[in-house]
């Protein structure tokens, strides 16, 4: 308590129960709620909630979700957005969109975990560790990532220390 950030990630199906649990432990100010599913319904729930958790939308290869987040960012202050993209050509990773998020004070969070499907256009941990970190983590930095989620924190920190 008062030390950690609670990441409620993709929990829309049981969000009221999860939120009640956090309230019982008086830790509502430590929550970051992340969701890609039904952003409009999540947003409606947030508006009705007595408490306002920090909400970070996950935009998962979805133009409609991207536009929804860009539109609602005018009146709901997102601390960050998580961008999930299959390849480099997706509009969400364009400098125009990234610059727009940054101009609104919204951090860009990119997940570089390696799964069975691309989360960041294959600029992931495997690319960074076994090919060239400049093509992985470096590419993400060059394209505006403020936060890189990784399972290889030490290696990423070493790369960033070397780079900067």
Predicted regions and their residues:
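C-terminal active-site rim and adjoining tail of enzyme catalytic domains
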Residues: 56-164
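Metal-dependent phosphodiesterase/phospholipase catalytic core, i.e.
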Residues: 1-64, 83, 104
């Amino acid at each position: 308590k008062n030390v950690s950030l609670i990441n409620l990630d993709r929990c829309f199906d049981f969000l009221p129960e999860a939120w009640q649990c956090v309230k019982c432990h008086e830790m509502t100010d430590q929550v970051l709620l992340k969701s890609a599913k039904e952003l409009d319904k999540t947003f409606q729930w947030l508006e009705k909630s007595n408490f306002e958790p920090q909400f970070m939308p996950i935009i998962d290869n979805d133009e409609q979700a991207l536009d929804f987040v860009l539109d609602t960012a005018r009146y709901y202050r997102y601390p960050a957005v998580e961008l999930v993209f299959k390849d480099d050509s997706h509009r969400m990773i364009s400098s125009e969109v990234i610059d727009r998020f940054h101009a609104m004070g919204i951090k860009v969070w990119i997940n570089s975990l390696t799964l069975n499907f691309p989360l960041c256009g294959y600029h992931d941990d495997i690319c960074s560790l076994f090919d060239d970190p400049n093509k992985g983590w470096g590419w993400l930095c060059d394209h505006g990532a403020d936060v890189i989620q990784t399972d290889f924190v030490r290696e990423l920190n070493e790369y960033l220390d070397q780079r900067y």
